[in-house]
Amino acid sequence: MLILKDEDIRRLVTMKEAIAAVEKAFGELAKGRAMMPPRSTMMLEKGSISLMPSYLQETGTVATKIISIYAQNPAKGLPTSIAQIIANDPETGKFIALIEASYLTALRTGAVTGVAAHYLAREDSKVAAIIGCGVQGRTQAWAVIESRDIETFRCYDLSKERRRAFAEEMSRTLEVEVLPVDRAKEAVKDADIIVTATTSKIPVVKKE
């Protein structure tokens, strides 16, 4: 059985490739050539665990993601979401791969935003706002810049330290201006693209 860890995915898959794969999967699902049943979620006292099965006819790929979401994990030095993917042989059901998928989940979720930015955002978009400066915020920013020629990101997070660290890291990584701001309202003002990457249960971006 093939075993892949997060560092393998980082080395093997680029954001551009992830965006192309997600766009292809959306198309196959729309054409009825893929199956993606609703996720099954078990709610626990401190978090949730979900099962997400899928099948892609063109490649004969059968895979199920198991993902846990625990909002308090960062305080324990752990990521909010932890995921694994099990792949099966479609002919026999035999396990053929086990994939550590926390990074892949962030990459894939970012890629969805990349597809959306390509088709929905104006071609002349130059300013983007990122609300939430965790792992997901990073892949969201990466995906947006793969789809549009963004010149400036404005980032907001409840943690001043996180937004400053995000701005420093992502300005180097993406080679664009990334500005940390003190309020979500400042981040989204006059932004061409707004991305939320937060587990907040109350609105962070408001109509006014």
Residue map of PLM features:
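N-terminal ligand-binding/catalytic initiation module
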Residues: 1-106, 114, 124
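Short helix-loop-beta connector
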Residues: 120-127, 149
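A structural signal for isolated positions on well-ordered beta-strands in alpha/beta enzyme cores
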Residues: 129, 152-154, 179
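Glycine-rich Rossmann-fold phosphate-binding loop(s) that bind the pyrophosphate
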Residues: 133-134
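N-terminal Rossmann-fold NAD(P) dinucleotide-binding loop
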Residues: 137-138
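NAD(P)-binding Rossmann-fold cofactor-contacting core
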Residues: 146-174
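Rossmann-like adenosine-cofactor binding region
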Residues: 175-208
